[in-house]
Amino acid sequence: MNPLIFTMIMLTVILGTTIVMMSSHWLMIWMGFEMNMLAVIPLLMKQYNPRSMEAATKYFLTQATASMLLMLAVIINLLYSGQWTFTKLMNPTASIIMTLALGMKMGLAPFHFWVPEVTQGISLSSGLILLTWQKLAPLSVLYVISPAINLDLILLMSMMSIAIGGWGGLNQTQLRKILAYSSIAHMGWMASILVFNPTMTLLNLLLYILMTTTTFMLFMVASATTTLSLSHMWNKMPLITTSTLTIMLSLGGLPPLTGFLPKWMIIQELTKNNNITLATLMAITALLNLFFYMRLTYATSLTMFPTTNNMKMKWQFNNKKQLKCLPVLIILSTITLPLAPAITLLN
């Protein structure tokens, strides 16, 4: 892609998200979502092939449907309240439709169907944008309207997302699909605590973006897209491979790694609000997510056949993709909790 065009598209994506996050008018919010969606589609088709075109089409159809539902909710609310103000969401019907529309944009169950398919059909760099930056706009709207959200609906969607995110990743060998299902599960964790403690949702989002960004960057450095290609990294870059597997365990929520921190805090907050049954179900379902990451780590490190390239001086060219910020990201993505245990006191 032409660097000038790429820069313009990225600026439009950032501008669209910024408009959504800073506007107090429903029409401006809808316009920001549309700008963001139309600018992201060329990024998804950066590698011009049938798979990426199919992924971009699925993404467009899903997001267009969600935008239509969003506008429907805005119009219902306008007829009920008579104003376009962002914070005035008083109609229960409008609130339910709005939650469903934003859940579809985020990839919450039962509207999760597009996330694995789209992520699998695009490049790793585009997948990074899709699973991190594209979550900011809908989550920011949910954050502001959280007092008006239907509690039963959002808890049902979050519980389904955590369960589907765990079950869906069990039989996957494609790393992008594994991260897509992990994203669905993490969105479920964020949505579950949104009504009770919106600030904790932001902390969870920050840690999720940190861990997912680091994982994608490691995959891009190693050019790994499957579990088999991940196992072949041992001879060429053992440190990168070890870091990748550790961060994936952190994404699964293995204590005492960073990924355990948001799960621990969310379960603690749900228990404080007398949602003990929900907290127990979420903790049990989270084991599915941890299981497929542990199985992936075990299979990649201990059960793969050894490769024949054991020479000290390898014929491969040096990797040019090394990034200076990677060591810091790896440390933050793995041992934030042991380094700063006082973060658990945040509310």
UniProtKB/Swiss-Prot annotation:
Leader sequence residues: none
Subunit structure as annotated in this protein's UniProt entry: Core subunit of respiratory chain NADH dehydrogenase (Complex I) which is composed of 45 different subunits. Interacts with TMEM242.
Coarse class of the protein's main subcellular location: mitochondrion
Protein name listed in UniProt: NADH-ubiquinone oxidoreductase chain 2
Keyword Transmembrane: yes
Organism: Saccopteryx bilineata (Greater white-lined bat)
Keywords, alphabetical: Electron transport, Membrane, Mitochondrion, Mitochondrion inner membrane, NAD, Respiratory chain, Translocase, Transmembrane, Transmembrane helix, Transport, Ubiquinone
SS bond list: none
One Gene Ontology term from the biological process aspect of the record: mitochondrial respiratory chain complex I assembly
EC id: 7.1.1.2
Topological relation to the membrane, as annotated: Multi-pass membrane protein
TM segment ranges: 3-23, 25-45, 59-79, 96-116, 122-144, 149-171, 178-198, 202-222, 247-267, 276-296, 326-346
InterPro entries xrefs: Complex_I_Subunit_2, NADH_DH_su2_C, NADH_UbQ_OxRdtase_chain2, ND/Mrp_TM
Biological function: Core subunit of the mitochondrial membrane respiratory chain NADH dehydrogenase (Complex I) which catalyzes electron transfer from NADH through the respiratory chain, using ubiquinone as an electron acceptor. Essential for the catalytic activity and assembly of complex I.
Similarity field: Belongs to the complex I subunit 2 family.
GO CC terms, sorted: mitochondrial inner membrane
Catalytic reaction list: a ubiquinone + NADH + 5 H(+)(in) = a ubiquinol + NAD(+) + 4 H(+)(out)
GO MF: NADH dehydrogenase (ubiquinone) activity
Source species taxonomy: Eukaryota, Metazoa, Chordata, Craniata, Vertebrata
Intracellular or extracellular location(s): Mitochondrion inner membrane
Top-level enzyme category: translocase
Entry-linked Pfam families: NADH_dehy_S2_C, Proton_antipo_M
